[in-house]
Amino acid sequence: MANKKEEPGHSPLVNKKAKFNFELVSFIEAGIVLSGSEVKSLREKKGNLTDAFAKIKNGEVFLENFSITPYKNGGYVNHPEIRPRKLLLHKKEIEKLERQVKEKGLVLVATKVYFKNNLRVKVEIAVGKPKKIHDKRDDMQKKDAQQEIARALKSSNRYE
């Protein structure tokens, strides 16, 4: 069966800072409760996941600090830009996440928001451990070294 190509307007919103600030352990896909104008804004890629994280309250998971720009044609019924949004997970998944957060001191970070089957909005939540400053420096040094090697190889191939 051939894979369907993703439509250009529906590429996912990605939290690039999550990999830099956290050591991501596991990922879980969750649905999200949104209003109609929020879905329309997300179709136009008008969202920001940079500071988004999930919090467990009373056996429910909420996505905090997820900014969705108000829909330009929304009128007076538009949604607030930042508000807690409920995530849809099974009870066992919530209990598992709650145990990890309480026992191991891990954090729930939103890493990606995308449309599944061009209908439903899904959020990828990562369970992660915050990195220390020296870990971030090590990652930056490794990345710089890889870029130097790539540049050197590219320039050496150019003169052959």
Swiss-Prot record:
Family from the record: Belongs to the SmpB family.
Membrane-spanning segments: none
A Pfam family matched in the record: SmpB
UniProt KW RNA-binding keyword: yes
Region (Disordered): 132-160
One cellular component term from this protein's GO annotations in UniProt: cytosol
Compositional bias of kind Basic and acidic residues: 135-146
Keyword line: Cytoplasm, RNA-binding
Biological source species: Leptospira borgpetersenii serovar Hardjo-bovis (strain JB197)
Function: Required for rescue of stalled ribosomes mediated by trans-translation. Binds to transfer-messenger RNA (tmRNA), required for stable association of tmRNA with ribosomes. tmRNA and SmpB together mimic tRNA shape, replacing the anticodon stem-loop with SmpB. tmRNA is encoded by the ssrA gene; the 2 termini fold to resemble tRNA(Ala) and it encodes a 'tag peptide', a short internal open reading frame. During trans-translation Ala-aminoacylated tmRNA acts like a tRNA, entering the A-site of stalled ribosomes, displacing the stalled mRNA.
Protein name as catalogued: SsrA-binding protein
GO biological-process terms attached to the record: trans-translation
Entries under InterPro entries matching the protein: SmpB (IPR023620), SsrA-bd_prot (IPR000037), SsrA-bd_prot_CS (IPR020081)
Highest taxon of the lineage: Bacteria
Gene Ontology molecular function, alphabetical: RNA binding
Organism taxonomic ancestry: Bacteria, Pseudomonadati, Spirochaetota, Spirochaetia, Leptospirales
Compartments (UniProt record): Cytoplasm
CDD domains tied to this protein: SmpB (cd09294)
